[in-house]
UniProtKB/Swiss-Prot annotation:
SMART domains: EFG_C, EFG_IV. Keywords: Cytoplasm, Elongation factor, GTP-binding, Nucleotide-binding, Protein biosynthesis. GO terms for biological process: ribosome disassembly. It is found in: Cytoplasm. Catalyzes the GTP-dependent ribosomal translocation step during translation elongation. During this step, the ribosome changes from the pre-translocational (PRE) to the post-translocational (POST) state as the newly formed A-site-bound peptidyl-tRNA and P-site-bound deacylated tRNA move to the P and E sites, respectively. Catalyzes the coordinated movement of the two tRNA molecules, the mRNA and conformational changes in the ribosome. GO terms for cellular component: cytoplasm. HAMAP family: EF_G_EF_2_B (MF_00054_B). PROSITE patterns: G_TR_1 (PS00301), G_TR_2 (PS51722). GTP binds at residues 17-24, 81-85, 135-138. GO terms for molecular function: GTP binding; GTPase activity; translation elongation factor activity. It comes from Halalkalibacterium halodurans (strain ATCC BAA-125 / DSM 18197 / FERM 7344 / JCM 9153 / C-125) (Bacillus halodurans). Belongs to the TRAFAC class translation factor GTPase superfamily. Classic translation factor GTPase family. EF-G/EF-2 subfamily. This is Elongation factor G. The lineage of its organism: Bacteria, Bacillati, Bacillota, Bacilli, Bacillales. The keyword Nucleotide-binding applies.
Amino acid sequence: MAREFSLENTRNIGIMAHIDAGKTTTTERILFYTGRIHKIGETHEGASQMDWMEQEQERGITITSAATTAQWKNNRINIIDTPGHVDFTVEVERSLRVLDGAVAVLDAQSGVEPQTETVWRQATTYGVPRVVFVNKMDKTGADFLYSVSTLHDRLQANAHPIQLPIGAEDNFEGIIDLVDMVAYFYEDDLGTRTEAKEIPDEYKEQAQEYHEKLVEAAAELDEELMMKYLEGEELTKDELKAAIRKGTCNVEFYPVLCGSAFKNKGVQLMLDAVLDYLPSPLDVPAIKGHVPDTEEEAVRKPGDDQPFAALAFKVMTDPYVGKLTFFRVYSGTLDSGSYVKNSTKDKRERVGRILQMHANHREEISTVYSGDIAAAVGLKDTSTGDTLCDEKNLVILESMEFPEPVIHLSVEPKSKADQDKMGLALAKLAEEDPTFKTHTDEETGQTIIAGMGELHLDIIVDRLRREFKVEANVGAPQVSYRETIRQAAQVEGKFVRQSGGRGQYGHVWIEFSPNEEGAGFEFVNGIVGGVVPREYIPSVQAGLEEALENGLLAGYPVIDIKAKLFDGSYHDVDSSEMAFKIAASMALKNAKSKCNPVLLEPMMKVEVVVPEEYMGDVMGDITSRRGRVEGMEARGNAQVVKAFVPLAEMFGYATSLRSRTQGRGTYTMFFDHYEEVPKSISEEIIKKNSGE
């Protein structure tokens, strides 16, 4: 099968937004207009094309990023629908990694919301160009220019309208295009018929003002145009478009559009903007990686004649075809039935079938080309973030880093039959989601699952029940505490057993000191003159790493600690790797009395949006939860309280906030950093953990 769309006619985009800004509805409309679905599915009726897991349809939120392909004006647009809820930010990061551009959807009433900020920051980190779609222009309180101002105030983004709405709320009738200077009115309910007309008289002045602002902003992106502009010459439409495109692709400029996906207005113009202003795979820098086993840099340029290289960005279990691995091809082509190398794991994989996904049906294809997104069936060892490449030209593309889980709870199967199924099901879920971890507590024998927040784990337990038919009892959520030290000290660890026969002898002196926050464990070998032979030094490090997992105070992992091995002794016959491993762990135990160990707890960054009248009550509640209020700001007719609160105090907060604000308050929270636990509380935790 020959290539259908050239590289410059391909767009890989994501739709990103705050929860409920209308992201899935927007994606739906894109699929409708590009002829991929015949009937529009409404999210609030629970039947949308993109939200295909049962829970997504029930909760009306998007959890997994389904990847779909659509066609518009002889271009292919691959769309990844990303979740807007903070517990799923990893899904967002994962999809941003393989995109070339994104559409940020805002709610016209609220503008930039807390989760928009998080996702925007992630997109900036990965250098993803964006156009902004101000959605829900038909909603009461919709205000386009206010939404644009929030882009400047809250994100410091160089964003400029390239459209203006005609009317708002119930009177939202059409859209003015500030590049072509024409107006579009919508003739029928489905918005498929639009006609370009002259701008109505009452809007001409405003349109001219914003057209000039746009021209000035675009001229600043290009020196030649700036000269022309300063000399008072008119810029042509093509020059204006080219400048906006250049600025957008360089992540220096963000065009802002408006519309109402629900009312079918503005979506086709947004698709035009995706083609006009967002980059094709040829416009973004070639992806860099390195050759396995060496740190030599390798670059993979987009092109079908290049060696094959792709990144797996999502693994899911499908009830019909089994394990599906979604991947983005950066260079070269791949045929179904061929072999590739998973260079991350150094395994050979056979690609069984290749599917191009369309939200809920799939099309089998024989070849996938450079720049495309597809899903493979039959990969056994590949997980999220792995590189797939040509067996003769090996490369490892930069992979993704995922945060550690901050909350965990125990799950117990209700029956013996459930027990066997549960193990398999949890392993599958952990394979799909790198921020979900599962392990067995050796002391209690319980299965512990860990994730990024309460909603995250709720949904996992829900999936166990629905997809895998596993009934389980769920324990109360527990916080993942950490430990660290506050003082440096030199400590000895000596393990000697010499009572006839082969003995054991290991002896080390280690200096433990606090490391910078977030730096983790650092081991320094400071041995001179071979007082501890070279072959035993890895064992000292391994012994420390193991012992750090078991903690000093309450059995929680020790972080941000530096250990310098500077002295010790050995015995020609009795020393062994094992003996030095034990000696190192004994040194860490002895550090407890000298290094002032402390307990750390995860601090969450919390933003609560509440009507003014509940403000005092909500702030009092935050303080009673050991929270620190960092600031407040008015947002529309509501107040936003920003605070840091320990995760341990945030369980059940959703219910408490609902009852305090009669359901009108909303909040978002995500993990920010670790902080020392107050002494009285840490003593209780230590007591509880040592079983007193």
